[in-house]
Amino acid sequence: MNIIPCSIKTLKGLYDISGVEVGQHFYWQIGGFQIHAQVLITSWVVITILLGSVLIAVRNPQTIPTDGQNFFEYILEFIRDLSKTQIGEEYGPWVPFIGTMFLFIFVSNWSGALLPWKIIELPHGELAAPTNDINTTVALALLTSAAYFYAGLSKKGLSYFEKYIKPTPILLPINILEDFTKPLSLSFRLFGNILADELVVVVLVSLVPLVVPIPVMFLGLFTSGIQALIFATLAAAYIGESMEGHH
């Protein structure tokens, strides 16, 4: 069986995805590298929103939480429950990772509909939600894969790789490919949904600029939240699966 060549081709294909371009892009030239400025700018805005919200909400922590502190404690409890359900009793160390993934994707998705990115003019292209770019979604998916392998190896050591020949060695190629197709499915699902949502809204606004786009925008906010939840749930499930060693 051509297992190694097939795996190399899959990895190369995943790497090449980061070079896919949709529309025009604005780049910064730093040394000999071209930096995708649009994604960095919008990602920094999202990170600033998240950090700023947390700092404001918990600047004066109370024993009995109120207002913003109560809201963020509810979010933390939700993420902990999600992690515990998917990972199991050893979920604790993974709560920050799952929470970061969920919150970054959630705020990124919503920023595409709620923030006026389009009014900011760039020499080339335009600003949009970070998750509207395949580079961002591939990076998030690769981080999930790295966490997936780290969880399995830290729990079981080299015996982790025994799972590839279970329940029978015949499934070795399929089990190997499964680990490389997971980031592909994660990245394309998130990228496709967010890109399609923004394109639909842009088209409807250009055709019927007043009433019709509003319900679509609310639907987009709902589906954007669902996509963040799906990504975080699958990431936690993959980590739990690697630690338990079953499919």
From Swiss-Prot:
It is a multi-pass membrane protein. GO terms for cellular component: chloroplast thylakoid membrane; plasma membrane; proton-transporting ATP synthase complex. Its main location: plastid. Keywords: ATP synthesis, CF(0), Chloroplast, Hydrogen ion transport, Ion transport, Membrane, Plastid, Thylakoid, Transmembrane, Transmembrane helix, Transport. One of its GO terms (molecular function) is proton-transporting ATP synthase activity, rotational mechanism. Pfam families: ATP-synt_A. It is found in: Plastid, Chloroplast thylakoid membrane. The chain crosses the membrane at residues 38-58, 95-115, 134-154, 199-219, 220-240. F-type ATPases have 2 components, CF(1) - the catalytic core - and CF(0) - the membrane proton channel. CF(1) has five subunits: alpha(3), beta(3), gamma(1), delta(1), epsilon(1). CF(0) has four main subunits: a, b, b' and c. Belongs to the ATPase A chain family. Key component of the proton channel; it plays a direct role in the translocation of protons across the membrane. This is ATP synthase subunit a, chloroplastic. It comes from Brachypodium distachyon. The gene is atpI.
